[in-house]
Every structure is written in structure tokens, then in C-alpha cells.
Amino acid sequence: MDDRDLLEIIRPVCGSDTCSDDCAILTLPCGALVTSTDMLHERSDFPAGMTGWQIGWMSVAVTISDIAAMGAEPLQIVLAIGLDTEERLAEIVLGAQACCDTYGAVYAGGDLDAHSELTIVSTGVGIIRDGEPVRRGGAKPGDIICVTGTLGRAILGLTGDSRFWKDLCEPQPRVREGTVARLAGAHAMMDISDGLAISLYDIAAESHVGMEISSGRIPLPPEADVQVALEAALYGGGDFELLFFISEEKMKNLTIPVTQIGRVSEGLKITMDGMELPKKGYLHHW
């Protein structure tokens, strides 16, 4: 089983409406708060060679990326850190603070404990002051499928290409882009940290639609081998870019550079270049 299978155990308890997005939502009279939490382990999430500062940065960035995917502004981060050795703490919290400072969030402490493996749980709160969050369930047939940035960089760094090592270790959440997409009228959005393919399937499942994308339109690093980079972009994960869906009419409202990779279709099939796209991505398995 993988983490998406296990989510089906949680849905009946919490309710599908609260378990279907990058963040949980608390509606306010004048906007909304969004919250997300992420658990990272050294063996599975922090590659050998990462500095403590980069570990702290990444631990915060993954949560801020979830907040960005709702079109929200990050407010506050708390970290629960299970330390394997106390000497690592100072560098980790400096990296965490740097990421918070970069994206306008407050690092507000958290919890400390001893642990045999370095484990960090990051919890974040974001706010939308002027509207509603963008969820995963709003994609409509005819919508244009858009992504920010270039994809595949993180896995290229993980597999030995030093040109992309920083992309892997110091992800840059797309907070501004998420807000712009929300204000432009995006119908659905999520981050693609688990890979583009599985993210398309996640949106399709919540929106009850199909999708048609073109491999030639997926933005890849020009300096990398095309096929290797395409595989990394589709299935590798680690790219904290945004995937969103917007009508052709509302595309003119966007003030950020994005790439159009396809369209939403009727039915439930997802295809790339006319062939069914494998449902694969970065998953935790039990």
C-alpha cells in the first residue's frame, strides 16, 4: 500500500472534503486560514551531502509550498524536531529561519525530542485575506493545464548531476505565483512535489475530469538530456512547482510566466501524446 491508499482509511473519519487538498481550510468571516503539516525523515528525505542549513530550509519549504498551492500567504511555521545528535540543531534552525524570512512567515518555535533518526515535522499556517482558497476539485473540461518553472531538476540533482543539486536541497516555493493564479481565477491547483503525472491524477480524481497533455510542451531544463529530464519531471518528484487549471478566457489575467501543457477533457482518462499516461510518482510504501 502507498500513502494515497492509506488516505482512504482517513477520509471516512475526517470527511473527504477536508482530506483532498494540499492544506486544510478554516473559513473566516473575512477570508480563510489554511494549515498543512509535513513529516520528513533523514533516510528518505534528506540525501547524503545536504547541510544542516539545507535540511532546515527544505523542512520549511515543503510546507510553504502546500500553502502556496492554495493561493495563500504563509504566516507562521512551527517545527517538531527529533534530533539524533544535538550538534545539528543550530544549523537546522538557521536554515528554517532563512526560509521563513524569504517567504514572509514567522518561525515560531515548536518541539524538540531525541530520536534515533533525524525527523522533522513542519506545520504551517497561511492566510487568504481577499477570497477563497484554490482547491483540487474545480478543474473543468476545456480548462488549460499550466505549470510554473521547469520540471525534473530535483531528480536530476539527486541522481548525480551537480548542476541541479541546489534545486533538490533548496526548493523555492511558488508563493507569488500561487496568489497570482488564484486572483486570475484558477479553478484548481496543487504543487507537484510528488511528480507531474501523479499530480494530474490527483486533480482528475477530485474534479472528475480527464486530461490531455503533450510531452513536447512540458518545460524541462534545456541543458539536460530530454528523455531523462522528462522521466524525472513526470514521475520523480521533488519539484516544488505549481500545477493549475484555468479557462482560456482568464489566461489573460495571469501576470506570471507559465507553460501551457494541455487541456482538461471530458471523461476520466489522462493521456500524453494520445497514449494513456502511467499513474506513477513519488509515493511512500508499506
From Swiss-Prot:
Name the UniProt record assigns to this protein: Thiamine-monophosphate kinase
Residues that bind substrate: 45, 282
GO BP annotations listed: thiamine biosynthetic process; thiamine diphosphate biosynthetic process
Amino acids binding Mg(2+) 3: 22, 66, 191
Additional facts recorded: Reaction mechanism of ThiL seems to utilize a direct, inline transfer of the gamma-phosphate of ATP to TMP rather than a phosphorylated enzyme intermediate.
TM stretches of this protein: none
Domain of life of the organism encoding this protein: Archaea
Record function comment: Catalyzes the ATP-dependent phosphorylation of thiamine-monophosphate (TMP) to form thiamine-pyrophosphate (TPP), the active form of vitamin B1.
Pfam families assigned: AIRS
One Gene Ontology molecular-function label: magnesium ion binding
Binding of ATP, residues: 110-111, 136, 193
SUPFAM superfamilies cross-referenced by the UniProt entry: PurM C-terminal domain-like, PurM N-terminal domain-like
Catalysed reactions, as listed in the record: thiamine phosphate + ATP = thiamine diphosphate + ADP
Enzyme Commission number(s): 2.7.4.16
Binding, Mg(2+) 5: 194
Enzyme class: transferase
Residues at which Mg(2+) 1 binds: 37-38, 111
Species for this entry: Methanospirillum hungatei JF-1 (strain ATCC 27890 / DSM 864 / NBRC 100397 / JF-1)
